[in-house]
Design a protein with these regions (language model features):
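C-terminal catalytic/acceptor-binding lobe
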Residues: 2-6, 13-16, 159-161, 165-241
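Short, well-formed alpha-helical segments that are part of the catalytic scaffolds
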Residues: 6-30, 38-46
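Short beta->alpha connector loops
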Residues: 12-16, 56-59, 150-153
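Short, solvent-exposed loop/turn segments at secondary-structure junctions
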Residues: 14-15, 41, 82-84, 123-126, ...
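A structural signal for short, well-ordered beta-strand segments and their strand-loop junctions
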Residues: 34, 76-79, 116-121, 178-182, ...
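Active-site-proximal specificity loops/subdomain of glycosyltransferases
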Residues: 35-79, 84-99
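Conserved catalytic core of nucleotide-sugar-dependent glycosyltransferases
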Residues: 86-169, 241
């Protein structure tokens, strides 16, 4: 792929986010666009976002970014608006990493494995994220920072939460999804107002979990240690005939 990827910042109800995010976005290798809720573009531009598109909610924003990137012959990078730190795993020397460096690592992972979706570990704690092997397959790809090659998969519009679990399985059961273990990211997440936090409740979590377990039998199980959370299972191996 010759075109540099589109970097899409997925945001809503956080109009000051560009002030911090622009420091990371400086190293993005291609165009950068903010995808926000209706009526928010002016506030985001006032805070430093240059290109802003109003598309509605979370899943609508994610799918609009995919459509725009693929129509331009680009891969799509999606990043949440509350990124706080990117760093290299100590196994490859440690230290701060730029967004462009991480995007390149995810792009290479897709090229080397044939996967159409790449991402990073869901935690920046190295105790839970060994760097060997460098790539992991059949595991959850958290949607906070992903690289998506042109492909037919889209985020499920029935989901307002946990849409990245569904998206991971879609890719995993097609060309593949790969997690790059050598880079780590941290996000403000649930301590940050706005975004999905504004409607994340235990009832909404339970509804999303039920939907996912019905749609993908055998691919998820409840997390016994964390109510309202699920764990992704590897696909069952087929028995030889």
């Amino acid at each position: 792929m010759t075109q540099a990827p589109l970097t899409a910042v997925i945001s809503a109800r956080r109009p000051l986010a560009p002030e911090a995010m622009n420091l990371f976005l400086e190293t993005a290798p291609g165009p950068v666009r903010w995808y926000v809720d209706y009526g928010e573009a002016a506030d985001y531009r006032a805070a430093g976002a240059v290109e802003v598109i109003e598309v509605g909610g979370l899943v609508q924003a994610r799918n609009a970014a995919l459509a725009d990137a693929f129509a331009e012959g680009r891969a799509c990078v999606q990043v949440s608006d509350d990124l706080r730190r990117l760093r290299r795993h100590s196994a490859i020397g440690g230290g701060a990493a730029g967004l462009g460096e991480v995007i390149e690592a995810m792009s290479v992972a897709c090229a080397e494995t044939g996967a159409t979706l790449a991402g990073l570990p869901p935690t920046d704690n190295e105790f839970y994220t060994p760097a060997d092997p460098r790539y992991r397959h059949g595991v959850f790809i958290v949607g906070d920072l992903i690289f998506v090659r042109p492909s037919p998969q889209r985020f499920d519009r029935q989901l307002r939460l946990k849409e990245d679990y569904d998206f991971t399985v879609q890719h995993d059961q097609a060309a593949g999804a790969v997690r790059v273990q050598t880079y780590l990211a941290s996000f403000a997440h649930r301590d940050n107002r706005g975004g999905a936090v504004s409607y994340r409740t235990m009832e909404a979590e339970a509804e999303a979990i039920g939907y996912l377990m019905h749609k993908w039998p055998g691919r998820f199980r409840l997390n016994g240690r964390r109510p309202g959370e699920i764990l992704m299972r590897r696909p069952a191996r087929r028995r030889a005939a």
